Amino acid sequence: MKLKTMTMEWTGDELILIDQRKIPLVEEYVSCKSYKEVAVAIKDMVVRGAPAIGASAAFGYVLGAREMFVEDFNAFVKKMEEVKEVLANTRPTAVNLFWALNRMEDSLKKYGKIEGILEYLEEEAMNIAKEDIEVNKAIGRYGAELLKDGDTVLTHCNAGALATVDYGTALGVIRAAVEQGKKIKVFADETRPYLQGARLTAWELMKDGIDVTLISDNMSGWSMKLGKINAVIVGADRVAANGDVANKIGTYMVAVLAKRHGIPFYVAAPTSTIDLNTKTGKDIPIEERKHTEVTHCGGKQIAPDGVKVFNPAFDVTDAELVTAIITEKGVVYPPYEENLKKLFEE
């Protein structure tokens, strides 16, 4: 079984990831032949974006199964708990990571025997990856209906093919609209401190021939005031039961500005990102990353030695600021606490 997309390649023996830390200057790849190597790749942001992290973890689980394999099924299940724990401890905010690992573990236990288990787990990981692509295309189709011909969309971070197995969530909506023949322009904010907008979104859209303009983060409000923005579309790392959205740091700021200027603020996310067990955004753990991501840029120090740094990787946007949540099952509007539940009742 093999899979190859812009973000990842599964050869059957290893997981090869495009190194997103190096884009756009260099296109390099990192080969992961063990579950611990996959864990390091997730932790170090070789791969990032909630759906891409989830799929990578699923393939990491497969590699771990091969490393931990023993003939006794119960002993094997026990050893796989360690694999799951190592992979789960990489990034705390993205719920797709835990969703994918729980699905892999449930599949293992449901299969219930040692014969053929490695092949079965590989097939399940492939299913997770392939389903993600189809889900993203469905999100794109639903979301494209919200965009008019000639619209300019502001994006934050990267919720494109690079953040998923392929096609993307927020950028998937833009791709789908363009495929429908609509003329869509994109303003991509740079997304400090990791510059996913400048490095990844701009690179990805230019590869697709989609009209993209790069702005710094502090230009988004003025761009809105000048009437240059018709809609905002972002992805999500976790959506709480009440509609609060955890996403890349700076998302909350963009949402507040959109509200102030009467611009619709859309969140594009698969149902696997919706966590009904998390009541509100206050219950979402927010990862904090190393201070050098703020004090350095492009490998060069830009701040004084010893300065204190606060570097949360994510923030939480209140549900009241979200116009709608675009999923593979349709577009969800407020009240979110009621309507998000309906997605899982169908």
UniProtKB/Swiss-Prot annotation:
The record marks 157 as: Transition state stabilizer. Catalyzes the interconversion of methylthioribose-1-phosphate (MTR-1-P) into methylthioribulose-1-phosphate (MTRu-1-P). The keyword Amino-acid biosynthesis applies. It comes from Thermosipho africanus (strain TCF52B). This is Methylthioribose-1-phosphate isomerase. GO terms for biological process: L-methionine salvage from methylthioadenosine. It comes from the Bacteria. Belongs to the eIF-2B alpha/beta/delta subunits family. MtnA subfamily. HAMAP family: Salvage_MtnA. The gene is mtnA. It holds the Pfam family IF-2B. Keywords: Amino-acid biosynthesis, Isomerase, Methionine biosynthesis. It is an enzyme of class 5 (isomerase). One of its GO terms (molecular function) is S-methyl-5-thioribose-1-phosphate isomerase activity. The active site is at 237 (proton donor). PANTHER family: METHYLTHIORIBOSE-1-PHOSPHATE ISOMERASE (PTHR43475:SF1). It catalyses: 5-(methylsulfanyl)-alpha-D-ribose 1-phosphate = 5-(methylsulfanyl)-D-ribulose 1-phosphate. Its EC number is 5.3.1.23. The keyword Protein biosynthesis does not apply. Signal peptide: none annotated. Pathway: Amino-acid biosynthesis; L-methionine biosynthesis via salvage pathway; L-methionine from S-methyl-5-thio-alpha-D-ribose 1-phosphate: step 1/6. Substrate binds at residues 48-50, 91, 196, 247-248.
